[in-house]
Amino acid sequence: SRSSEAKALGIKMGDPYFKAKEIIVKNGVHVFSSNYSLYGDMSRRVMKTLKYFGTEIEVYSIDEAFLDLTGISDELVELFGKKIRNTILEWTGIPTSIGIASTKTLSKVANHIAKKEKSGVVSLINTKDIDIILEKININDVWGVGRQLTKFYITNNISNAKQLKNISNTWIKKSSNVLSSRTAMELRGISCISLET
């Protein structure tokens, strides 16, 4: 895992130490070894806390989960997100970021933004500025868009999430794959990727 500061220095996820050593030494970067048993224990505590807030939860990875907030009014959903974040911090001591949206892909966009926000919670429910927000999200930061797909999109003048959202279904079907179609639909607020509980 990398801190925001390490990312800003250009240290890539998964880079071996020897590749980043010059940057690490030059900038006084601190490197820590992994403690997977501790991470696993902390992850279980966070996921258990999340289950307190809803019955439908998808544990996506050791440090990510999707929670179904159906039934929470649009007006209260961000406040509910803050309650979840504060409870996790109180019960586990772990600061989190929470992204709330109508689809999994948009919730990942919201979470991407929340990581930089002081409150740590961002809701894209009823956001009128969705195109402005998506325009600021680089195509390689869109959930499900890997390196090969990023190259393909950039070659086809699609460099941000707004452009992918607005691409025609005909173009996607002709030029890409079903995953691209789902991602574009999700960016439009149409849920195509269901919760896996």
Language-model segments: which ranges?
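Generic non-transmembrane alpha-helical segments
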Residues: 45, 49-53, 83-92, 152, ...
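DNA-contacting surface of Y-family translesion DNA polymerases
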Residues: 141, 149-197
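Residues that scaffold, gate, or flank divalent-cation-dependent active/transport sites
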Residues: 1-62, 66, 187
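Short beta-strand-to-loop capping motifs
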Residues: 67-72
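Long, highly charged, low-complexity intrinsically disordered interaction regions
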Residues: 76-140
